[in-house]
Amino acid sequence: MTVHNNSKIGLIGQNVLFDEVKLIDDGLMDKFILDIQNHIANPTKKSAELIANVRCWSSWLANGIKIEPIFNGKKKACSFIPWPLSGLLLLSSRITGQQPEFEYAADYVLRSGILPDQELDNYDDLSKNIDYIRSIKPLVAFHDFDGNEQGFRMTHLAMERTSNMLIENALLAAEGVDIKENLEKIELATMQSNQLFNAMWKVSEPLLYNKEVRIFIQGLFGNQGSIYPEQGLFFENCGDIFNENYDSKGCYLSNLHGQTGANSSYHPIADEITGVGNHTHAYICLLYTSPSPRD
């Protein structure tokens, strides 16, 4: 579905992704509803993975058709999600508790790359870090499989891989087990994450970030009234609002936030478990107290 598919032009580059999505069999929605009913009656790991996969890949397709016009000379994105993709995305999002918008963890990075079997022994060598990031293969992409998008996304995936050490030792430290040793391992994990982060602009051109990377993950919030209509996205057959442009009924969703690596909980966890958060106050939630009613 990419703009560039290695040496070929992908579906977005050919401006045919929307047309291909409209060919999806309506029967998939009926089948998915049955799958969900079976999962509710008898939940299994396999049935849960099926629902998560539908959520992930329907989100990829929806995001692809949204941005397709931009890469084909248009100033406006596509704001129409056709049936049954619209139903698959909304229902799977509801079941998994996700927003029906592209998400950093579930879609863009963590579920869409194939990690090599072996990690590096350490991350002190920048050139090895670059090779390691380039060895991570994306399952799907919007712009390219081996260029700026691959570099940006797979840098984040490599960083998240080091979180195994962070989470394991944070839990042990919180339980009071070998606190000094576990805090040192947390420090090591965050250092490795930062070492990989330092390779990002070696594998992804910063001047092309907005054009080839950011545009796919920026969401509706702040973009309605510009590249998207004021009403937001229209999901066909998911409501009773009539859309004259597409001669169909559905519903609008608006102000959905896009996501980037800043949505990862990795470094907030590290800051809180080490006490850094006490000094930065970055993650303190200020509670709102309503004024007292007048006598």
Predicted regions and their residues:
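Non-transmembrane, amphipathic alpha-helical segments
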Residues: K46, G147-A158, D178-E181, K185, ...
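Hydrophobic faces of stable alpha-helices that mediate helix-helix packing
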Residues: H156-A170, T190
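Extended amphipathic alpha-helical segments with heptad-repeat/coiled-coil character used for oligomerization
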Residues: I186-I284
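Short, charged/polar, low-complexity loop and linker segments
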Residues: R134-R153, E168-G176
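Acidic, mature catalytic/reactive cores of soluble proteins
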Residues: G73-A77, E181-L188
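Conserved small/polar residues in nucleotide/adenosyl-binding loops
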Residues: Y288-D295
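Long, charged all-alpha helical bundle/coiled-coil segments in cytosolic proteins
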Residues: A41-I133
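Intrinsically disordered, low-complexity acidic/proline-rich regions
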Residues: M1-H39
